[in-house]
Amino acid sequence: MPKLVFARHGESEWNLANLFTGWADVDLSENGTKQAIEAGKLIKEAGIEFDIAYTSVLKRAIKTTNLALEYSDQLWVPVVKSWRLNERHYGGLTGLNKADAAAKHGDEQVHIWRRSYDVLPPAMDHDDKYTAHGDRRYAGLEDSLIPDAENLKVTLERALPFWEDQIAPALKEGKNVFVGAHGNSIRALVKQIKKLSDDEIMDVEIPNFPPLVFEFDDNLNVQNEYYLAPKKA
């Protein structure tokens, strides 16, 4: 029964500062590093052995993936990085304090931007200091593929080809898969995996820790879903 382990990156410096992050490439906080290490230890304790790992091209997810693999004694496992697993792009909200954004735009409007399935936040200008246009890590992409703002619907549309081309085939081959990604890119894939409605996914939250595990049958029907927890003494 193949397993898929989702690990949202450990707490980032901007999570700690309560800032909208999106595609901004911020680092893990000290606590976030500890969370990634603990994720690896939980994976080792659970005896889960991976055949392949996937992550985004943002350092907080890459570092979480590397630490989780290191502390589960699986640092040799191949890791594939893809922009399609990046966090949702928060557009013009990127870098803003969430409380300041609410004061400026109103609590209700910010809540709609954050939690609705298909409402886009304000677009990011191409000359914004956080723009992905011109960023070397996206040099191989057509400029039209680089977003200026995303909602969860668009995030799923972006992540879905990677699921269909890479992750799902690996699981169908019976491989155990690790995905180190982000709250909203994981939520998007969970919507696909569990066939959730647009309304149902709105109530789904993915914590920075611990990792989330799915077990599948041969047709990728979910047989079990749980968060890793320390074994009781």
From Swiss-Prot:
Q: Which GO terms describe its biological process?
A: gluconeogenesis; glycolytic process
Keywords assigned by UniProt? Gluconeogenesis, Glycolysis, Isomerase
Binding of substrate occurs at 8-15, 21-22, 60, 87-90, 98, 114-115, 183-184
Where is the catalytic site? H9 (tele-phosphohistidine intermediate), E87 (proton donor/acceptor)
Pathway assignment reads: Carbohydrate degradation; glycolysis; pyruvate from D-glyceraldehyde 3-phosphate: step 3/5
| EC number, UniProt record | 5.4.2.11
- Which parts of the sequence are marked as the site Transition state stabilizer? H182
GO cellular component, alphabetical, reads:
cell surface
Q: Which CDD domains match?
A: HP_PGM_like
Checking InterPro entries in the record gives: His_Pase_superF_clade-1, His_PPase_superfam, Phosphogly_mut1
Give the enzyme class.
isomerase
Molecular-function GO term, any one: phosphoglycerate mutase activity
Per its record, the protein catalyses:
(2R)-2-phosphoglycerate = (2R)-3-phosphoglycerate
Which family does this protein fall into? Belongs to the phosphoglycerate mutase family. BPG-dependent PGAM subfamily.
Relate the protein's function as given in its record: Catalyzes the interconversion of 2-phosphoglycerate and 3-phosphoglycerate.
Q: Which PANTHER family match?
A: PHOSPHOGLYCERATE MUTASE (PTHR11931)
**HAMAP family xrefs:** PGAM_GpmA
In terms of NCBIfam families, this protein maps to: pgm_1, PRK14115.1, PRK14117.1
State the name under which the record lists this protein.
2,3-bisphosphoglycerate-dependent phosphoglycerate mutase
